[in-house]
A protein has these predicted regions:
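Extended alpha-helical scaffold and adjacent linker segments that couple domains
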Residues: 1-196
Length: 196
């Protein structure tokens, strides 16, 4: 049995509260799905930015060095995906991916190494972003199930679900901006030098 409350009234029911339902759904989501959705949200956010500044192009979450072109046409920003976070040290996943992309394009050596800069996620902020994405996916799923008729909610619960879904999406947007905080760029004469 579950305890419910509304406007100072409390009662027991055999169905879980809306918040409990969302928390259960969020807890059941697979990590891989959450990471894919974070990369999608990152791409959507980056592509919505109109002003690219001094960057000729911005590439989001490439699957490998082969997806990053090697041309002289200006500075390219490579926004590393969620699989390559940075922890402020040389041995991070982000630094390994940056070195791989800087040294080669696919199987061929990269010629225009000095035209690339990288933006990477802060490893410490990533967990809070994952939690926010789980909540957003859970509330969106509740809304979808309500619209499809698979979930029968009261009108007050529908309004609450819409508010919670919007709030969760806003939290994801905020956390995306907070998480991608590292700028990594090549410098010096050596092939593998990079500065963060």
């Amino acid at each position: 049995k579950f305890m419910h409350g509304d406007l100072g009234r409390y009662w027991y029911s055999t169905s879980p509260s809306l918040n409990r339902m969302a928390a259960d759904r969020a807890g059941q989501l697979e990590e891989a799905l959450v990471l894919v959705e974070i990369d999608k949200a990152l791409g959507k956010y980056i592509n919505s930015i109109g002003d690219r500044g001094h960057f000729e192009t911005v590439q989001v979450a490439p699957d490998g060095s082969g997806e990053v072109p090697d041309d002289p046409g200006g500075v390219r920003a490579v926004v590393l995906g969620v699989d390559h976070p940075h922890n402020g040290r040389d041995g991070s996943d982000a630094m390994a991916e940056c070195k791989d992309i800087l040294l080669q394009r696919g199987n061929t050596p990269r010629v225009y190494r000095n035209t690339l800069v990288f933006i990477a996620a802060d490893n410490r902020q990533l967990e809070s972003l994952k939690d926010a994405m789980r909540a957003a996916l859970a509330w969106t799923g509740i809304m979808r199930d309500t619209d499809n008729g698979r979930l029968d909610l009261k009108s007050s619960d529908i309004a609450l679900s819409k508010d919670k879904a919007k709030e969760a999406q806003d939290t994801v947007s905020t956390r995306l901006k907070e998480t991608w905080a590292y700028l990594i760029y090549p410098y010096g004469q050596g092939k593998q030098k990079a500065r963060q």
